[in-house]
Amino acid sequence: MELLTILISSLLGVVAPVGVVIDQTAENAIRSQFSTVEQLQVRVDNAPSYQLLQGKVERVLIAGRSLQLKQQDFRIAVLELETDQIEFDPSSLKQNLPKFKQPLQAGVRLVVTEQDLNKLLQSPQFLNGLRKLNKGNSSAFQFAGASNFANPKVEFLPNNRFSFQVELQNDQEVIPLLIKINSGLSIVGGRQFQLVDPEVSLDGQEFPAEFLNLIISNINQQLDLRNLEGDGLQMRILKWKMKPGKLEIAAFLRLEPSSKFLETRR
């Protein structure tokens, strides 16, 4: 979720508090969203220039390499973003939070490496979130008695498949249980992620088919991007390419002016 917040903050950052949008100002605002940046280029198309005073920006293009998130131990190998026309209320800049007159639309392309994703999976923030998800889940996906997850690892495979494993620790077992998942991942209608031909085992024993179907159904529901529409965000996946070593994603984003995600800079 932090990555989504950063993308939106980057779009908001192109509008300077004083009401002047220029390439360097926009680049500095976007750069401030990351702890380290190897390469970053920003171009703001704003012709004729007087449109800016009316609260209009024709287009913003962002291209970055090796961008390290501030709050998570995660690096984005490639970030490319291009907006449609941005139209906002100039008087709203006094609150340092532009009020948009029309939906904010952008295309984005991301590349993440397997190594960087594994660093994120092994971070305390992710493990704590995984533990909370398990405790708060009343479905068959919950593992009773589990007190901790450890050593998660993902591997990208050919043909949009992946393998994932994690150790499941509890107070009764001295040796942790090992959960392994091998599955494809497809996109249905650009909005629904679905696991394809999944294989799940616990300490080498395959899950019973009925139990596995319940787990997969729960996961697929969580991976439905339409769940975000209630918060004013529409997202459509245009490209999903997983291969050994890296994952490439291209998507279209549309945020309504009332979207709660536009409140991230308050």
Question: Residue spans of the language-model regions?
Answer:
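N-terminal beta-strand/beta-hairpin edge segment
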Residues: 35-116, 124-127, 131-172
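Extracytoplasmic/luminal low-complexity segments enriched in Pro/Gly and acidic/polar residues
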Residues: 186-266
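A short, surface-exposed beta-strand/turn
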Residues: 77-89, 179-191, 264-266
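Short amphipathic alpha-helical segments
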Residues: 17-26, 109, 113-126, 207-215, ...
